[in-house]
From Swiss-Prot:
Residue ranges constituting the HTH arsR-type domain according to the UniProt record: 305-409
SUPFAM superfamilies per the UniProt record, alphabetical: P-loop containing nucleoside triphosphate hydrolases (SSF52540), Winged helix' DNA-binding domain (SSF46785)
Domain of life: Archaea
Assigned keywords, A-Z: DNA-binding, Transcription, Transcription regulation
GO molecular function, one term: DNA binding
PANTHER family the record matches: GENERAL SECRETION PATHWAY PROTEIN A-RELATED, PHOSPHORIBULOKINASE _ URIDINE KINASE FAMILY
Listed name of the protein: Uncharacterized HTH-type transcriptional regulator MJ0774
Length: 409
C-alpha cells in the first residue's frame, strides 16, 4: 500500500474507533493548552485567594505567595492561569523556572524575560507603548540578547539593578504590576542558594513587584531553614491538597462531558468499576487521573474496544507505573525490591528460610530486610503453626502477581 494512503487510512480508522467509544476526541490531554482554562484542575477557593492577592497588590498591599502541593497536583497549571489572567489585564508577567544561580544571574534572567515577554515583540521591535524609552531599552536588549548561557561580563550587577529599577518605575505603567512566576522553587532550598535568598530579602519587598513561587508542601519550611527571614517575604501560602473523591469524579466527568458525542452517558466509555478504580488508585492527584484516563483511551483505540473496563485501567496503570503498588516498588531499595519480587514468585507469602534458600542469601540478611519492609507497612506477618509467614500487601500483590493476568488481554 502507498505509505501516504496508509497513514490517511490509519488516521480515519482512529476517528471511527473514537466514535465507537462515544468520544469526539481524547479529552485527557495532560499538557494544559496555554490560555485555555476549560480544563482547570484546581478549586475555586484557590482562585479566590489568588484574586484577593492580586487585588490587594493593585492597591499597594503586596504580599508574595507560595503555591504548594504534591507533584502532579496542578501548581504549574495554576501559574499558567495566573499568567494569562494578569496578562489580559495588561500587567507585566515573567515566567521563570528556579535554578541554583547567583543573584546577578537571576537578575539577568529576570531583566531579559521582562524585555522579551512584555516590551519587545517577537520580531525584535519595541511595542508602541514604550517607544519614548526605546534608546535605553534597546541598549539593555543588545547586551542580553546574545549572551545565551554565558553571563555578560560587561554588565555589572549594579547596572542591571538600575536598569531593572528604571523599567519598573519609569517604563511600566504605575497602575500595573510586574508579576514574577517561579516554578519548581524547591531548587532555591539549597545552601548554595543562600546568597540568592539573602538578595530576595530586599528584592521581594520592591514596590510594584509581586511574586508567586510554586513548590512542594515543605517549600517554605525548606527555604526558611536556609534563610529564616524569607518567611516574612512570602507571607501567603496557597495550599493545593489532593482532590477529594467527589472532586476526582467531577474532574473526569467535566472532561468527558466536553468530548462526548450526543447520547453518551455520564462516564462513557468508562464502566463504573473502571472509574472507581481510577479514583481509588490515583490518590486525588490530577496528573495521575488524567494520564490514567488518557492511556486507557489509547489502549481502547489500539484494541478496537467500545468500553473501558477495570482490566483496561489496570493495564494503563501498569504501563504508566503509577498504581500504588508501583509507587511502593519505586520506594524500595534494590535489595528490598528483590525480596518482594521473590515473595511474589513464591505465591505471595514465604518464611525467612524459604526466601534465604530461594535467593541464596543468609537468613539474617533476609530477616533484616523483611523487618524494614514490614515496618513500612508493605508486607504483613502471620503465624501458621511454628512458622512465621511474611505476606505481600494487596497493593504489591496487585502489581507483582496480577501483572501477568493484566497483560493477557
Amino acid at each position: 500500500m502507498d505509505p501516504i494512503e496508509f497513514i490517511q487510512k490509519s488516521a480515519s480508522s482512529i476517528a471511527s474507533t473514537m466514535h465507537k467509544l462515544k468520544l469526539k476526541y481524547n479529552p485527557f490531554s495532560e499538557k494544559p493548552i496555554r490560555g485555555n482554562t476549560k480544563f482547570f484542575v484546581g478549586r475555586v477557593s484557590e482562585l479566590r485567594e489568588i484574586g484577593e492577592i492580586l487585588g490587594s497588590a493593585l492597591h499597594g498591599s503586596v504580599a508574595n505567595a507560595a503555591i504548594v502541593g504534591t507533584k502532579g497536583i496542578g501548581k504549574s497549571s495554576m501559574l499558567n492561569i495566573i499568567y494569562y489572567a494578569t496578562k489580559k489585564q495588561g500587567h507585566w508577567v515573567v515566567e521563570m523556572t528556579a535554578s541554583q544561580v547567583t543573584p546577578r544571574q537571576f537578575l539577568i534572567q529576570l531583566l531579559y524575560n521582562i524585555l522579551t515577554e512584555n516590551i519587545i515583540t517577537m520580531s525584535g521591535t519595541i511595542k508602541s507603548d514604550y517607544m519614548e524609552h526605546s534608546s535605553r531599552i534597546l541598549d539593555m536588549y543588545r547586551k542580553l540578547n546574545n549572551y545565551g548561557d554565558k553571563v555578560p561580563i560587561h554588565y555589572p550587577r549594579e547596572r542591571i539593578e538600575r536598569d531593572l529599577e528604571y523599567l519598573i518605575n519609569e517604563v511600566k505603567s504605575p497602575d500595573k504590576l510586574c508579576i514574577i512566576l517561579i516554578d519548581e522553587a524547591d531548587q532555591f532550598a539549597k545552601k548554595s542558594c543562600l546568597s540568592l535568598l539573602q538578595f530576595f530579602h530586599s528584592f521581594l519587598y520592591e514596590e510594584g513587584i509581586l511574586t508567586f513561587m510554586a513548590g512542594s508542601p515543605t517549600l517554605m519550611d525548606d527555604l526558611t531553614k536556609i534563610s529564616p527571614p524569607i518567611k516574612d517575604r512570602i507571607p501567603k501560602i496557597i495550599n493545593m491538597p489532593p482532590l477529594s473523591k467527589d472532586e476526582s469524579y467531577d474532574l473526569i466527568r467535566r472532561r468527558l462531558e466536553d468530548a462526548h458525542i450526543d447520547g453518551a452517558e455520564e462516564f462513557e466509555p468508562f464502566t463504573e468499576e473502571a472509574i472507581h478504580k481510577i479514583v481509588e488508585e490515583c490518590d486525588g492527584i490530577p496528573r495521575k487521573i488524567i494520564m490514567t484516563c488518557s492511556e486507557s483511551i489509547s489502549i481502547a483505540i489500539r484494541k478496537g474496544l467500545t468500553k473501558i473496563d477495570e482490566k483496561v485501567v489496570k493495564e494503563a496503570m501498569h504501563s504508566l507505573g503509577i498504581s500504588v503498588g508501583h509507587q511502593i516498588l519505586n520506594h524500595l531499595t534494590p535489595a528490598q525490591s528483590e525480596i518482594v519480587r521473590a515473595m511474589a514468585e513464591l505465591g505471595g507469602s514465604a518464611t525467612v528460610t524459604q526466601l534465604a534458600e530461594y535467593l541464596k542469601k543468609s537468613p539474617s540478611t533476609i530477616g533484616t530486610h523483611l523487618s524494614d519492609i514490614y515496618e513500612m507497612g508493605y508486607i504483613y506477618k502471620e503465624r501458621e503453626g511454628n512458622n512465621v509467614y511474611y505476606k505481600l500487601s494487596k497493593e504489591l500483590r496487585d502489581v507483582l502477581i496480577g501483572e501477568d493476568d493484566e497483560l493477557e488481554m
